[in-house]
Amino acid sequence: VRPPPASRALAAVRRILAGIPLSRRKVAMPVYVESVTQPSPQDLTDLAKIYADAPEWLLTPYASAEALIEAALADGSLIAGRFNDRLLGAALLRRGDEAWRLSHLCVRKVTRKRGVGRRLLEETQRLASEAGKPLRLAAPAGHLEASALAARTHLPLDSL
């Protein structure tokens, strides 16, 4: 009797992982990207934690993380990555007539390096492509982190 296909696939993954040292394994989280329009109290707590981990320059032109979240909810530009009913990363996505602009991308410090930011970016690229719009990144001028992300993703970078 052969095991079901799912069991065979899991066994194959285990065989592959057995040959990779634990220190070299990257754990990607199954993150679901969504527009945040009616956040729950827990979502608001998660968003506050996400942007509490943001460097000060990332909040520009907003006076605070709270102001950024409030403005993004008001204009419908807030997107977030969810895993196990918790928001782990967020960004602002402005859907313009000529192009879409992604800005203020931030992931909670405790979940960085697990694919949350990459998942937000990939889903944004997919949605922009489906809408027939080019995607551009936007960040305050002169920040190396934003320039590095633009270079890695081959996306144009606009100044906020």
Model-identified regions with their sequence ranges:
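Conserved acetyl-CoA-binding loop-helix of GNAT-fold acetyltransferases
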Residues: K113-R126
